[in-house]
């Protein structure tokens, strides 16, 4: 059992299940407004697995299937950008592989993976720059105008 209370098998099964659920969500035309780990509630089901619930859905939208769009890619960046102590790079790759399913090794998905890595690194750098420039104490100072 790891620091998060899950065995390696449980963690891998949970990542597989979450990837499948996110894929189904996207296949149905939904794009979450803020799909970050803190907006995913995980609860143990009656068996071995976990059930996942997406929270903070005020900006979640469903788009018609005939409308070509790539907004779902933003959800992958949102999920990937937060460093999580118990989620390794290999875990992230397992998630991506399961998300892509049988089409994992296609050229389009290899391009998507490179795009995702670039976007994630850029977004993390932007967030780190904000954190470095602005301390909590400074944020709390009232700015008179």
Feature roles, as predicted:
Residues 1-33, 38:
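Conserved kinase catalytic-core helix
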Residues 34, 44, 61-63:
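Activation segment
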Residues 36-37, 41, 110:
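Short loop/turn and capping residues at structural boundaries
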Residues 39-54:
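Conserved protein kinase catalytic/activation segment
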Residues 50-119:
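C-lobe/activation-segment region of protein kinase-like
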Residues 121-145:
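Conserved NTP-binding catalytic cores of kinases and kinase-like/nucleotidyltransferase enzymes
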């Amino acid at each position: 059992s790891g620091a998060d209370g899950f065995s390696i098998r449980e963690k891998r099964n949970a990542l597989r299940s979450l990837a499948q659920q996110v894929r189904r969500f996207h296949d149905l035309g939904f794009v979450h407004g803020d799909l970050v780990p803190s907006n995913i509630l995980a609860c143990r089901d009656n068996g071995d697995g976990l059930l996942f619930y997406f929270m903070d859905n005020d900006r979640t939208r469903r788009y018609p299937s005939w409308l070509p769009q790539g907004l779902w890619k933003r959800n992958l960046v949102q999920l990937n950008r937060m460093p999580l102590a118990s989620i390794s790079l290999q875990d992230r790759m397992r998630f991506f592989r399961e998300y892509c399913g049988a089409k994992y090794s296609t050229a389009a998905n290899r391009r998507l993976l490179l795009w995702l890595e670039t976007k994630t690194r850029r977004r993390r750098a932007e967030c780190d720059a904000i954190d470095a420039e602005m301390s909590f104490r400074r944020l709390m100072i009232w700015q008179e105008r």
